[in-house]
Amino acid sequence: DFPPNTCCCICCFIDRMYQQNHFIISSNSNSSNQNKLVSSLEGKVWVQDVPSLHLLRFFLYEYRNWNSFITPKKCESMFVFLRDPFIHYVRYQAKSFLAARGTPLMMNKSQMLENSFLIDIAINKAKFCNALGHPISKPVRVWYLDIIRINDLVNHD
């Protein structure tokens, strides 16, 4: 496990790498280390929103066999979720949907899904939107349930 001072050193190192036009994700096989790393990033300026932290936890969980991954910032488009404030994260019937505004891949997928009547029925049943089409947001409840689900997935390795 990381002692608290090590988490601070990692955050300083990540900030320095980010300022030098590099992007870094560090991962160990121990999932508690990954959780501590992500939770230490929660206060950083360049990771501001909760959905990006969920996605980072998912990324670290899926690629936990990597020891480190450092790439030039010009390849940062793969990791647009870390700096894009327009991420939409929805959970419905134990499934997660992620969409980032402005990325061509997500735009194409959302246009394909827009033609599907099943999506409209699912959204209407789940009451994600009111009668005017505006989203009904419960960020605290969603955040809490997602943290519980992520912790359950991580602890059942």
From Swiss-Prot:
Q: Which domain of life is it from?
A: Eukaryota
Q: Describe activity control.
A: Inhibited by HgCl(2), iodoacetamide (IAA) and, to a far lesser extent, by SDS, hydrogen peroxide H(1)O(2), KCl, NaCl, ZnCl(2), AgSO(4), CdCl(2), FeCl(3), PMSF, Pepstatin A and EDTA. Repressed moderately by many organic solvents such as diethyl ether, ethy lacetate, acetophenone, butanol, trichloroethylene, tetrahydrofuran, methanol, chloroform and dichloromethane, and, to a lesser extent, by propanol, benzyl alcohol and chlorobenzene.
What biotechnology does with this protein, per the record, is: Has a potential role in leather processing industry due to its dehairing activity for animal hide without hydrolyzing fibrous protein. May also have application in detergent industries due to its stability and its ability to hydrolyze blood stain.
Give the record's note on temperature dependence: Optimum temperature is 45-50 degrees Celsius. Stable up to 60 degrees Celsius.
Q: Tell me which UniProt keywords the record has, alphabetically.
A: Glycoprotein, Hydrolase, mRNA processing, Protease, Thiol protease
- Please give a single GO biological process term from the UniProt record: proteolysis
Cellular component annotations (GO), alphabetically ordered: chloroplast
Protein name from the UniProt record: Cysteine protease Nivulian-2
